[in-house]
């Protein structure tokens, strides 16, 4: 089989006539272009060996790569594999290849293409203008001789990019692996004929690479010598940017003479260095010519500034083998050793500064052993269709193969843990399916011709589809959720438009027909950004949507040397001769320097003030010790390179253990806390143990988490819709069912998040909070509808830069920005905040039209904030060499005080040495602070603070009046119960509820008070506070008196607007939805009716349209089909009440800590002062406003004195958390630590450093006429629903609203609605039984009981059972089937 077009021009027909038109897309015959072996860089092991070939391989090491179109990239590839039809040895010696070594051998009926991996690809003979396509290698080989290819050919456009003389020459061959190119030109070297030869000289029986041509007609040319000792060899290259490189070649005799001269000049005995080499090796014929160096000899951009040294140099063994490589700085970077017996067979290699890796071979030339003196070693055992790999940890992997030569594939893999994975391939070696260790299969559908994946089907049956144009470019991709990515291209194959799955469109513009670099882009907002490029494809300037320009400078090697931004900001970078970054300097001249070892590892960072941070590495370049400011951390690794031990600054250890597949199975922390992990066959975590606390993790077929059990009880549950989007998460918190519900639009964007809390016994809804999001036509999330508030709309310009904010229709905040889009002025009524920046871009000042609140900032050379000055006081900060805050010096009119902060090496707070000079405490090895100047602390085995007791100073008589704080946690280490006692009597008690995401949703506090008998005891009724969230930001706090809602600055945890509404006012806003109103009064005799969920959704949509005064035509047509009008429906809606609200602006410091609340009149109605750790120092609150926000992400709890910080609780007195970090080491080595420089750093999530009772609704009274209208509307809608069930899926309303989730089951049931009479009877029984025995029966069980007793006929209950999706009905149907 040839792989040629099914019908080719020139083929003869049965009756003798030739075919004049052929099909370029359909191919016939046996595969052509099949390689002699698999790709050397395909399946590899260790450092690296290809076990399928048994070959030592180095897939690619790049020595030269300057930027530009069609750049000259000199990369080396090594393989000890030996093909039976080798090309001659190249200029890098036996076993080595570079891209220029591609060669085509012309034989009688076969073409043999030798690639740069040392392989041979076999093609059938080609006639002029004919092509062969290797489906296994996705490679075309085309013979010249025609001006045009068939119009339907995938390479037709690329063919026309070639010069006409190349296209028309039948003696030239061209190869490419993409319809976008480039072409590899295979020609011959024009040599000078000998004197006795007949002219012209005959063409050789091979073709060599003479150049490249891309689809824009740009060329790279390889210059080969026409005569002399280097005839036919490449001695020069001109790249696509017209840079010229000179390749210095040497013969074996020249190298031998050079070796002798070096020995003589060095006074040593010359080593044996023969003048000639054998003419043949296992890797092909060898002429002994080698590449010695490569020079850059012409650079159009830097004609007078050429490098004074070669870009790369090579050294050679006496046998002509590549021995060493020197980079452009002259430093040796690589060395190689070869077998004494077999020339070119590599037995060892090393990177400079790294250990030497050695190899052993069997008699067939296959690698049997890989020896690593500082890591894993491997042995290889070869059998028929089976390779066994065993490492030095005695872990074994077995590869089972099928196929031969280039079609050899691994079809089964036995892993070290005994698990097995399998793969299936088609006839040309393309992957068709993979079966994981659990037996689940993922299927792949490659295009028959191109091999491009057109479909992926996962084990759960969900599929992704991919579509391509005729040039093999992706035009569309549809995910399992049905969302689609689309791309469009111009005639040159350049991307001109991309439509993201969410509908955002990005467009690309080009002004140069010979370049693939865009000159402009246009985003979904319509904002246009322009770019200019150098001839080498480097970005020179970027102009944003406002016309502001950023400029870039580069050196001759393509490295960025400077960035110049608007407002005078610049950054400069310097590099050493090896191209390593050695210095970065800002506009003010502050310079950070970098140092490296011989292997290129970064060993030191020197700050502008000269302080030094150092890192030491092991033999393989893994950091083993870091030192900063005299403090050291160290890391240890096993032979597999896995971290096995960490040693903190305190000398404490954390240790790790792994399974045979390198998965973490045990972690023992600095404090001895041990956590264990168990994985299933596919690597998913299925069980975790935390000091006896056992958690099981459960997944569905799509590997999505479905539920978790802790100590045998169900914890969280996750639910997904048919598109795979998360819709609900629920769990039980302190007996309450707490859930989070999500809604999306048809583009997959989040449109709503609702938190609900239900009563433990009655399941009554206690709390509900919803935040909705809306997107403008450009896709920006510019509208947020907080719970019970008007919409918050963010006003933007350009690509989304913030310009202002509105609440409902009322503009509240305006912003002015500079040429870097930084805020310079913020206006809120009469309030104006002016912000200025230093030349280095740091915050310089924030000035108000109220002078007392002005703040000026001073920074040191290291970028640390060292002073904040205001009219009232000045605070100066001092830091350790590690960047930790060590002291605050505050000066004011009548104040001069310095507060020191002392920590142990790991960052744990220590007693102040000035106040406690007798303290001998120097560190807390386990990071658990057991005592300080005021308290004693106790922890449980999970590292959670469980008790804090007043410290009785020595010498003080104990009176048992110390206060004790006790903390209790749930299985997720969340604080759920707090008590404070004195004299063994409770002073305060609180309990906390959380949603499944760990966000606190409720707080109940009991305080000590005097009862009717005069005794002091805890109150019987708690003070209840509810919390509502928008993502990770706490937006709502509500108690029995007031609701406070916070609007944050977009993308931050800095509060912007505070809205307070009295609970009494809030109650007046409670109204039924249109659907509820119709259901409650739409039944027979004024009773209620139950609408199907889809109808409720449609009514909700209609109601939102009516409230926004934007009723769609689809909704109007739907109402008309029901015999209703918009006006009628509007009359059924409860009126909307607008409550009285207090609105304030938060005036915050540079971190986001509120300093003042400003009214719209510009008056300060609350202000406060804090220390650097967030402790309140003083407060002015004449209006009795409740302001509980502290440092970003923190909420003050009065009962405990702690700050709730999203994932944990923060103790401001200690400046640290009371529990360990949920994300472990990712958040830092000290699991309790808050940022040790709180002056500028924050932790709003309680995870890691950022370098910053609900009242029941009151029904609105209605007139009898309105009540009658409600009844009629409800009946009309119910009738419409039942009458149109069979056609509803095709209804224009649904078709035009793809985001509306249809209940297909309900549609199929054709109007199975629960009988209201039966429903009422069931509910009565449930309520009676609940109150009598405390257990709530299932409604399906009650209904079946009524049927069994004969109280209700099965026929009458059938509709209700179906509507409830009752399991008894399902079981009955199953029996019938």
From Swiss-Prot:
Tell me if Repeat is a UniProt keyword of this record.
Answer: yes
Q: Which UniProt keywords apply?
A: Repeat
**Which Pfam families is this protein grouped with?**
DUF6531 (PF20148), Ntox34 (PF15606), RHS (PF03527), RHS_repeat (PF05593)
Q: Where is this region: Disordered?
A: 1356-1377
In terms of superkingdom, the source organism counts as Bacteria
Q: Which stretches are sequence repeats?
A: 330-352, 353-374, 375-417, 418-438, 439-460, 461-481, 482-502, 503-525, 526-546, 547-567, 568-588, 589-609, 610-629, 630-650, 651-671, 672-691, 692-711, 712-734, 735-758, 808-828, 829-850, 851-871, 872-894, 895-930, 931-959, 960-984, 985-1019, 1162-1186
Instruction: Map out region (28 X approximate tandem repeats) in residue numbers.
Output: 330-1186
- InterPro entries reported for this sequence: DUF6531 (IPR045351), Ntox34 (IPR028947), RHS (IPR001826), Rhs_assc_core (IPR022385), RHS_domain (IPR053422), RHS_repeat (IPR031325), T6SS_VgrG/RHS (IPR050708), YD (IPR006530)
According to the UniProt entry, the note on domains is: Each rhs appears to consist of a highly conserved 141 kDa amino fragment followed by a highly divergent C-terminus.
What does this protein's UniProt record list under function? Answer: Rhs elements have a nonessential function. They may play an important role in the natural ecology of the cell.
Report the family membership. Belongs to the RHS family.
Q: What is this protein called?
A: Protein RhsA
Organism name: Escherichia coli (strain K12)
